[in-house]
Structures are given as C-alpha cells and as structure tokens.
C-alpha cells in the first residue's frame, strides 16, 4: 500500500476530529500531501486554488502545525513543524490518450441532512415532499423531480433523502448524470453491461442529479429509459434534480419527458430575505465563523440567492480579515464583497433574456414571442420588456419587433407595469421571479464569457 497515501489519510483523519463536517468536506478534503517537497521540519500540501490556500493557512494553519507536531503520522518530523500550502500544478492531459474512466460516484454526502436544511416559504413544499419520500417504505410519488436555479439547495435535499434512506438500511445510488454517462461508457467499452444494469437497477433509491444533461445523448437516454422503467415497475423510488422543468429540457426525448412527469414535480424557488439571513447564520455556525449581525444582514441583502455564493462571501470576509489582521465590520464586508455584487446581467442579449424568462416561467421561448391572453404568457412578455430596458441598449422599436408588437408604444406600458409591481412589493411571486431571472441571466452570461475566453 502507498505509504504517502496512508500519511495523507492519517493527517486528514486527525483534522476531521477538530473541524465541522461541512468545513472538512468543503476545504480540508481537497488537500493533497506533497511528500517530495516535505522535510523533517516542514510539511507541504497542495490545494486546488489560491483562495483555499489562503483560507486554510489563515484560519487553520496553527491547527495543522499542532497536529503534525504532536502526532508522528508515519513521518520523521521535528518537534516543531511548519506547514506550507500551495496551489496544485495543472496536469496536462493528452487528448489522444486512451480515456481513463473514473469510478462511479454513488456515495451520499453525509453533511447534507434534513436537520441542517434551512426551510422557508420558498422551499417548504419541496422539503415536505422530500421528507415524505425519504420516510416512506413504498414510493408515495414516483418519480419526484425537483427543479430550479443553481445554488438553491437542490443537491442538499437530494443528499438528505439519501442519508435518511441509508439510516433505514436502504440501498441508495446517488449519481450525477455526468457520472452515470461515464460509468455507462466504461461498461459499454468493457462489454460488462450486465454489471452496469445490476448496479443501477437493483437499488431502493435511485437519486439522479443534473438530469438535464441526459439530453442529446441517444444511447444514454435509451439506457436510462430502460433503467427508469425497471425501477418504476419494481416500486423503487426515483428522485431527479434538474435546473429546469421537463418540458423545458430541449433535446430530451419525449418519452423521457413524459416519464419525468408521471409522479410529482416541484420547483425550488429563490429564498426570500428572511430565509437568506437564516442560511447565512447557519453557514457561519457550520464554518465556525463569527460575524456581526449587520454584516450577516448585508450579505443576505446584497449577495445573490445562490447559497454557495453566500457561503463564499462569508469565507471571503473571514479570510481577508485574518490576512489583514483587521476586525470584521460592515466597512470591511463592503470592500471585500464589492466584486461579488457586480451585476453580470448587464449587457445581456435579448435572446438570453427571453430564454431566462422562459425557463423561469416554464414556457417555451416561441410562446413568449407571440401575443397571448394567457396570464403567464402576458406576464412573461412584460418581464422580457422590463429586463431588456434594464440591461440592453436596444431601442424601443427593435424590442417591439422582437416581440411582434405592432404598436411600439406598448413597450413603455409593459415596462411601467412590472416596475410598479416591484416597487409596491405587493406581489411576492413577481419579486421572486425577478431574482430567479437575474440568476439565470448571470448563469447564461457567465457561460458565454467562459466560452469566449476559451477561444
């Protein structure tokens, strides 16, 4: 057995006893021991990025030194040991080389439970459905599909179902569609499909994350179709997570869309301010970070609805305060988080605005571009106008043409209608829609930026 690998495991096992489960999983589990650079008086570790290097060094550098100084952990160390954490070097991959398929990930993250899931009006329905599914011996709804924007807690609730099922000694498979594809290709290549089918069709709970990525892969969709049918026929619980509703997953086979809607579908809405503040307080507690009340309120008010971004903001404030040896106050928070508050929705295209509105209201883009008396379509058209006026330089006439409006004076009325609803704050649905559409625009624009930077 690899001695260096054992050393790394011993060190991390000792760290795990000293920090919170979420802190360990999110940060320390990513550390890699570097035996080649380490000496008797200094231990080197690799971390995947500079933020993680700075965070662990500032907040837990002393803890690592203490652990290494007091425990031999398979190394010949001096009494006093220094610790260095560096960014891991990038590994060049030969595109022509044979694919080395990674093992399938079916493990459930034990840090995601129902007990530490923050419940609010935005997600109460999803929470209750998930608990009922996890607690039932036979599927009350099958399948269950939860959908919504990035970072709203969908993966947390999926893992919570898995953890509860494991406590009841059920056989659980939790996998992303990407890993499902990887494992499928590996078994297909090795001609071991019987083993693949046994793995995924002989479980009590089949939990699939990022179900939207099944689309556009005919062989994978075919295999998943048969896996779904067998699980469903044998009354095995199926839970799916997606970033959009089934009918809005473009390119997904109709027969799969139909099956996704056999049971119950529920949307995870963006959190309201009260829920966001509760999330911020919980993340501070789990990460053992103390922030003043006004700083926590500032994060809840000014950082997006993405829970991971809120947690990132908390950590960023703590890291910077440690590095600067400064007290955490509102001024520090405003300075540190300035870049996180920049609105990525600026400069959106009309096409992206249309797509973001369509996904948020479970409509097709083509439906919104045609005038209709249906309330949801009429609201969608008003929202397209509102965001187009906010984020694009398009003149009124071209916007009217985009929405096939003969009277371009209607644009001002549509914009004013939405603006009034938002200012009066009498319609919580429209308020939550605004945040969801902004989040989707940020995602779409970030993808475009990443694509352009890679060209």
Curated annotation (Swiss-Prot):
Which parts of the sequence are annotated with region: Domain IV, binds dsDNA? Answer: 322-455
Q: Please verify whether the record's keywords include Ion transport.
A: no
Using the UniProt annotation, give all residue ranges assigned to the region (Domain I, interacts with DnaA modulators). Answer: 1-75
Residues given in the record as ATP binding sites: 151, 153-155
Query: Please, which domain of life does this record's source organism belong to?
Result: Bacteria
Record InterPro entries: AAA+_ATPase (IPR003593), Chromosome_initiator_DnaA (IPR001957), Chromosome_initiator_DnaA-like (IPR020591), Chromosome_initiator_DnaA_CS (IPR018312), DnaA_C (IPR013159), DnaA_dom (IPR013317), DnaA_N_dom (IPR024633), DnaA_N_sf (IPR038454)
- Enumerate the Gene Ontology biological process terms: DNA replication initiation; regulation of DNA replication
What keywords would UniProt list here?
ATP-binding, Cytoplasm, DNA replication, DNA-binding, Lipid-binding, Nucleotide-binding
Against Gene3D superfamilies, the record matches this protein to:
1.10.1750.10, 1.10.8.60, 3.30.300.180, P-loop containing nucleotide triphosphate hydrolases (3.40.50.300)
Instruction: Cite the residue spans of the region called Domain II.
Output: 75-106
**Molecular function terms in GO for this entry?**
ATP binding; ATP hydrolysis activity; DNA replication origin binding; lipid binding
The domain comment in this protein's record states: Domain I is involved in oligomerization and binding regulators, domain II is flexibile and of varying length in different bacteria, domain III forms the AAA+ region, while domain IV binds dsDNA.
Q: How does it assemble?
A: Oligomerizes as a right-handed, spiral filament on DNA at oriC.
Output this protein's name. Answer: Chromosomal replication initiator protein DnaA
The organism encoding this protein is Helicobacter pylori (strain G27)
Upper classification of the organism: Bacteria, Pseudomonadati, Campylobacterota, Epsilonproteobacteria, Campylobacterales
